[in-house]
Amino acid sequence: SYLNNQLGYRDALLDTRSIIKKGDYIVLDPDGLVKNVVPGYENCDVTILGSPAMGATFADYLVHVHEGGKNTGIGGEGIESFLYVVDGELSVKNDDQSAELTKGGYIYSPASNNITFEAKGEATLYVYRRRYEPVAGHSAHTVVGNANDLEWMSYEGMENCYVQDFLPSAHDIGFDMNMHILKFHIGAS
């Protein structure tokens, strides 16, 4: 992988520990992550983690942004998008808001409202996009925040699992998805 400098194949030509069971699950070995060319990403190394071609109903990417790297529009007609800053900082905007995001920062952009970004230095991002499924009379809206500002809450009453919800989907049916981080006690699952 270009990320960990483990180049070549383990035992045989095209050998990998990654598993893709189309429409069921995907396990990607870090050694097998590759750079992809994805339109709109400039001065970025993009790894496709999931896509409709793999059987998913979404596309998600791990993006390593180099200094001055940018994207000219994440989303599309009917597509909702989410961007999370794993490391670094960048400027983001959509039709509704602009923000400076640092590590832990995120932006959710509703359908047909593209996200653009530009990095000041190196940054690592998680990007997710999918077709929005509307409920009559309800709609989603832009959400900007930072995981570092959210409290950990007990997940569904469990004593060993905690959640940080990024979107208000638990009480706003205009959101057809959620993004969150789960944290488990050691040995719990």
Describe each region flagged by the PLM.
Residues 33-73, 152-189:
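A short glycine-rich, His/Asp/Glu-containing loop-to-beta-strand
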Residues 67, 77-95, 189:
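Glycine- and acidic-residue-biased ligand/ion/polar-headgroup-sensing regions
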Residues 1-44, 56, 60:
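Transition-metal
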Residues 1-3, 120-162:
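Double-stranded beta-helix
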Residues 44, 54-56, 97-98, 111-136:
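Ligand-binding loop in jelly-roll beta-barrel domains
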